[in-house]
C-alpha cells in the first residue's frame, strides 16, 4: 500500500486527494462572498465536510451491514468527526507517528486509510491491511506508513507513542507522535506513566483525549478527579505539558488548538494534551444500547451538538454551501461508501491454513545464523559477567541497540551489576535508567522497536514483572501476528528469577510457565555462563521478542562458570544440550534444578553404577522435543525436574508431550519433581522445605530407576 499524506482529503478511493492548505486567516478569502472563513477557501471547506461525511456515512453503513448479518461488530465515531479531521489535517503519516484508538475513524481516513480498506477489516478479509482479518474492525494499522497495528486493550498505545517519540529524539528526527483515547482510558495507570515520561523528557507527543463523557456506561464523574470531570485539569501538575480543553464538535476551534499544540511540541518545550469535549451519538459499540443508561433528554442535547450539523450550518450561513449542493454531496458520499463496501465484501477470505503463520519471524534470519561455531575456550567466567560481556559486544555491534531499566546505568550498573560499565562506554543516550514502572519499560520498548530500534530492557526481579504483562502479552508478543507480519516488536526482556537466595515471597519467583502460555514469545533459561552469553547474543540479533530468564542463584556460582566464548558465539533457540549421557533414565531440567540433577546423577553413578542422562533444555520456548523424545526412547524412563511450582509448572507440558509421543517406549510412570504449591518463605528452613532440594532430586531419580 502506498503512503498517504495526512494533509490530503479523499474525494473517492479512485481519485487523487485534494490538498487542504490552511492560511491561518491571512489573505485567503472566499470567492463567493469575500469573507475570511477561518483562513479556508470554499474548496478546502467542502473537502473537510466530505471527510466528515465519509466517516459518518461509513459508520452508518457498517451498522446496517451488521443488522443484515454480514458483519459481527462495529464501533462508531459519530459525534467525534470534527476534531478528528482537524487533527488529520496536521499530522503526516509519512513522518509523524500515529496511535489512533478504535473510535478515531476520521483521523484514520485522513491518514490515508480508504473506506474500502476499513470495510476489508469489517468483513475480516485476507486483504485487510490492518490485520488480514485477525483483529476486530477499526483496529487501525497501515504498512509503509507510521501507523502501527493498534489493539483492543485501552491505554497500551500511550507508552508506545512515548517510545516512538523517544526513538525520534535519539535519532534526531523532528516529528510528532500522536496518540488518542477516550476519557475512560485515562483511568489506566499506563496513561499517567506515559504523560509522566513524556513530560519528564519533553518528548514530542500529542495526547488527544476525546471526551464523550461515557466509558461504555460509566459517566465521566465516576472516572476522573479533574475539575468538572476534566482530564486536562487532572494533569495540571505536569509543568512541561501544554494543556487545552476544547470544544471538539467545533472544527475551527479544534483545528486552531491542535495547531497551537503542535507548534508547542515542535518548539521542544514538551508534550501536549488536548481534551476534546465531543458527543457520542451512537452507543458505545454494536453490542451496546445506550438508551438503557442515558435519558432521552440527554441524547437529544447531544444531537444538538452534532459536529457535522454545526459545520454545515456554518457553511450555509456563509454562503459556501447550498441545500442542493449538500444533498448532492451526501448522495455522492453514500454511493462511494456503498461501492467501497461492495468491493470489500467480494474480496477473498483468509485461508485457514495460514492461521499459525507470522507468530514469529519467517524471514529465515534465525536459520541463517552461524550457531556454536566453536567451543568456548577463553578464561573461566561467571554467568553475570558473561551476560555483561554479551551486552557490551552486541551494543558495539549494533548502533540501534538500546538498554534501559531500573538502576541499570553507572555507577550502580544494575542491582546484580549485569549492566556495569555500559552507560560509561556507550553513553546515557543509549544506556539509561527508567522510571520505577515496569509497564513503562515494556511499553516504551515496544514503541522504540516499532521505530526500528532494538531495545534490550531489564526487569529487576521477575516478581515485579507483572505490571508489564499487558504490554508483553497483548502488544510485544502479539504485534507480528495481529498485523499479519506488517509490524513487529523484537524486544529482549532480561529478568532475574528464582529462589534459593532467601529472598522471600517477592524476590524468589519463577515466571517461565506463565509466560510460556503467551504465543509469539521466545523464552530462554540458561544454566551456565557460556549458554547465557550465546543465547543472549542470539536474542539481540533475531527479529523476535525474547524473555530472557537469569537465575539469581547462578549469577556467581562456581559450578555455573564456563570458559568464555568469543564474540561470535551464538546458541540457537530450541536446541537442548545433553550435559550427561546415560541409559537408565532421562532427567529433563533447566536452571538451578538442572545442576542439582546433574550432581545427583553423578552421585548415583558413583554409588550404584546407575546411568542417568541429564538434558538441559536451555530454552522453554521453543522446546527441543526431538532431543527429549530421542533420549526417552533410549532410556525408557523420564523425570522432569524444575524449581517452579508443581501445579501449572512447565514440567507438566513437557510430561504431556512425552506421554503423547513416547508412551509405548515407557517402562515406568512419567515423574515430575518441583516446588510445593505455596509461596516461597523468607526463613531458610521454610524455603528449603518448599523448593526441591538436591537430596529430594537424588531420591526421585533413584526411585524411578528402581521402579
Where on the chain are the PLM-derived regions?
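A glycine-rich helix N-cap at a beta->alpha junction
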Residues: 124-128, 199-209, 430-433, 476-495
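Glycine-rich ThDP/TPP pyrophosphate-binding loop and its adjacent helix/strand module
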Residues: 146-338, 346, 516-636, 640-641
Amino acid at each position: 500500500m502506498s503512503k498517504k499524506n495526512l494533509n490530503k482529503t479523499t474525494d473517492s478511493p479512485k481519485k487523487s486527494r485534494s490538498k487542504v492548505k490552511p492560511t491561518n486567516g491571512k489573505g485567503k478569502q472566499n470567492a463567493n462572498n469575500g469573507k475570511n472563513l477561518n483562513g479556508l477557501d470554499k474548496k478546502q471547506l467542502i473537502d473537510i465536510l466530505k471527510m466528515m461525511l465519509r466517516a459518518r456515512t461509513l459508520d452508518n453503513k457498517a451498522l446496517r451491514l451488521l443488522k443484515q448479518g454480514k458483519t459481527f461488530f462495529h464501533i462508531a465515531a459519530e459525534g467525534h468527526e470534527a476534531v478528528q479531521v482537524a487533527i488529520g489535517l496536521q499530522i503526516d503519516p509519512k513522518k509523524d507517528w500515529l496511535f489512533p484508538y478504535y473510535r478515531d475513524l476520521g483521523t484514520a481516513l485522513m491518514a490515508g486509510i480508504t473506506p474500502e480498506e476499513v470495510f476489508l477489516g469489517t468483513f475480516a478479509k485476507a486483504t485487510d491491511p490492518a490485520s488480514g482479518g485477525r483483529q476486530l474492525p477499526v483496529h487501525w494499522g497501515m504498512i509503509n506508513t507510521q501507523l502501527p497495528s493498534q489493539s483492543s486493550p485501552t491505554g497500551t498505545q500511550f507508552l508506545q507513542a512515548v517510545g516512538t517519540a523517544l526513538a525520534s529524539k535519539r535519532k534526531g528526527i523532528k516529528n510528532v507522535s500522536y496518540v488518542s483515547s477516550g476519557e475512560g482510558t485515562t483511568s489506566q495507570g499506563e496513561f499517567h506513566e506515559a504523560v509522566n515520561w513524556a513530560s519528564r523528557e519533553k518528548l514530542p507527543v500529542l495526547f488527544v483525549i476525546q471526551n464523550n463523557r461515557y466509558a461504555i456506561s460509566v459517566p465521566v464523574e465516576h472516572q476522573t478527579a479533574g475539575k468538572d470531570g476534566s482530564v486536562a485539569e487532572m494533569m495540571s501538575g505536569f509543568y512541561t505539558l501544554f494543556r487545552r480543553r476544547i470544544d471538539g464538535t467545533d472544527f475551527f476551534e479544534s483545528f486552531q488548538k491542535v495547531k497551537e499544540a503542535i507548534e508547542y511540541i515542535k518548539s521542544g518545550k514538551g508534550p501536549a494534551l488536548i481534551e476534546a469535549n465531543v458527543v457520542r451519538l451512537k452507543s458505545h459499540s454494536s453490542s451496546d444500547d445506550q438508551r438503557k443508561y442515558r435519558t432521552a433528554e440527554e441524547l437529544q442535547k447531544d444531537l444538538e451538538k452534532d459536529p457535522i450539523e454545526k459545520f454545515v450550518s456554518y457553511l450555509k450561513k456563509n454562503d459556501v454551501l447550498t441545500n442542493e449542493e449538500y444533498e448532492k454531496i451526501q448522495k455522492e458520499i453514500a454511493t462511494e461508501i456503498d461501492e467501497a463496501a461492495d468491493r470489500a465484501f467480494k474480496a477473498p477470505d483468509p485461508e485457514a491454513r495460514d492461521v499459525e503463520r507470522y507468530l514469529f519471524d519467517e524471514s529465515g534470519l534465525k536459520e541463517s545464523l552461524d550457531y556454536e561455531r566453536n567451543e568456548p575456550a577463553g578464561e573461566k567466567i561467571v554467568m553475570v559477567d558473561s551476560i555483561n560481556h554479551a551486552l557490551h559486544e552486541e551494543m558495539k555491534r549494533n548502533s540501534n541497540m538500546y538498554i534501559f531499566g531500573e538502576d541499570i546505568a553507572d555507577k550502580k550498573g544494575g542491582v546484580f551489576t549485569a549492566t556495569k560499565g555500559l552507560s560509561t562506554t556507550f553513553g546515557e543516550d543509549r544506556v539509561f535508567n527508567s522510571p520505577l514502572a515496569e509497564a513503562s519499560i515494556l511499553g516504551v520498548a515496544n514503541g522504540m522497536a516499532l521505530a526500528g530500534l532494538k531495545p534490550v530492557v531489564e526487569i529487576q526481579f521477575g516478581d515485579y514483572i507483572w505490571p508489564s504483562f499487558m504490554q508483553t502479552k497483548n502488544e510485544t508478543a502479539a504485534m507480528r501476528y495481529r498485523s499479519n507480519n506488517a509490524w513487529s516488536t523484537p524486544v529482549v526482556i532480561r529478568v532475574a528469577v528464582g529462589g534459593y537466595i532467601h529472598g522471600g515471597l517477592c524476590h524468589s519467583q519463577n515466571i517461565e510457565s506463565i509466560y510460556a502460555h503467551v504465543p509469539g514469545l521466545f523464552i530462554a533459561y540458561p544454566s551456565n555462563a557460556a549458554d547465557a552469553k550465546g543465547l543472549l547474543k542470539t536474542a539481540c540479533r533475531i527479529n523476535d521478542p525474547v524473555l530472557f530468564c537469569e537465575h539469581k542463584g547462578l549469577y556467581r556460582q562456581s559450578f555455573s562458570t564456563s570458559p568464555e566464548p568469543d564474540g561470535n558465539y551464538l546458541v540457537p533457540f530450541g536446541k537442548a544440550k545433553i550435559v550427561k549421557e546415560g541409559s537408565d533414565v532421562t532427567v529433563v531440567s533447566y536452571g538451578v534444578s538442572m545442576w542439582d540433577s546433574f550432581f545427583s546423577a553423578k552421585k548415583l553413578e558413583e554409588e550404584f553404577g546407575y546411568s542417568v542422562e541429564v538434558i538441559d533444555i536451555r530454552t522453554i520456548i521453543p522446546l527441543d522435543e526431538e532431543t527429549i523424545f530421542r533420549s526417552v526412547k533410549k532410556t525408557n524412563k523420564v523425570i522432569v525436574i524444575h524449581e517452579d511450582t508443581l501445579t501449572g509448572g512447565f514440567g507438566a507440558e513437557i510430561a504431556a508431550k512425552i506421554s503423547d509421543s513416547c508412551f509405548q517406549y515407557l517402562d515406568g510412570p512419567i515423574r515430575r519433581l518441583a516446588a510445593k504449591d505455596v509461596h516461597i518463605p523468607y526463613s531458610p528452613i521454610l524455603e528449603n522445605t518448599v523448593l526441591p532440594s538436591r537430596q529430594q532430586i537424588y531420591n526421585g531419580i533413584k526411585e524411578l530407576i528402581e521402579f
